[in-house]
Regions:
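Short internal beta-strands
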Residues: 91-93
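Acidic, His- and aromatic-enriched active-site or binding-groove loops in soluble protein domains
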Residues: 108-127
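A short, hydrophobic C-terminal helix/tail in secreted or cell-surface proteins
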Residues: 234-238
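Positively charged, Gly/Ser-enriched RNA/tRNA-binding surfaces
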Residues: 2, 10-87, 97, 133-229, ...
Length: 238
């Protein structure tokens, strides 16, 4: 007929429909996992496919989820990879509230999404080209671009990065909330048995979609950087 049809883009929309239909029958927080084929209408190239398997792990709350749930997912990533015999992998953790709060300190709240999407290209194009894009395309000043690159370049042990972030605390409520959440996630990841060699606070991690509101993660094989990200995860309040 004339019906508009499409192949399944992801496993998230079907999950949202399922929760909406069975809301009264579910016990919250509702945990589930699913593996299935999904499809993307993009140009096929190395590391990008039009058809592939996606594995989803989700925790759905009836209201606001406790921050400890945001540490549960990366601990499952660690258990999964370890069970598969993979050892040299790293779960990179950040919090969107930290980024939004920092950009608000610079007076760039309205450009935060564009900044994050530009910074997301750092591994591919390098810091100098990211700086150029921030100035020429996003429209931030050269001074702000330098502040952004300085901020996302903070590295070290997890304790060292968190300590450096303390230097920015007290100037923005959203930033402070994100920092508290990130500290809690790091604490619980250790409590759940994830070695620090397998997870790191990484301020370049943002994820591309604006509905991500809290903890964000990406996972990569350290010995095979040419392989695209194997596992990504994000927290969303809505």
């Amino acid at each position: 007929g004339d019906a508009d049809l499409s192949l399944r883009f992801d496993l998230t929309v079907p999950l949202a429909k399922y929760v909406a239909l069975h809301y009264a029958d579910l016990a919250f927080p509702f945990r589930r996992y699913q593996i299935g084929k999904v499809y993307r209408g993009e140009r096929a190239q190395r590391g990008r496919f039009r058809e592939f398997y996606q594995a989803d792990i989700d925790i759905i709350g009836d209201g606001k989820l406790d921050i400890t749930n945001e540490a549960e997912i990366p601990s499952i990533i660690y258990q999964t990879f370890s069970t598969l015999g993979l050892k040299r992998f790293q779960i990179r953790v950040n919090n969107r509230k930290i980024l939004n709060g920092f950009y608000a300190m610079l007076g760039l709240t309205d450009k935060a999404g564009d900044i994050m999407r530009t910074v997301d290209k750092l591994d591919k194009i390098g810091a100098e080209k990211v700086r150029t894009l921030l100035i020429d395309e996003v429209g931030v000043s050269a001074e702000s671009a330098d502040e952004i690159l300085k901020f996302i370049a903070i590295t070290g042990s997890n304790d060292q990065v968190l300590s450096a972030l303390e230097g920015y605390a007290g100037r923005n409520e959203t930033f402070d909330e994100g920092l508290d959440q990130l500290k809690t996630v790091v604490k619980y990841l250790s409590a759940f048995g994830v070695p620090e060699e397998n997870f790191a606070v990484d301020l370049t991690i943002a994820r591309g979609l604006d509905y991500y509101t809290g903890t964000v993660y990406e996972t990569a094989l350290l010995d095979h950087p040419e392989i695209c990200l194997l596992y990504t995860s994000d927290a969303a309040d809505d």
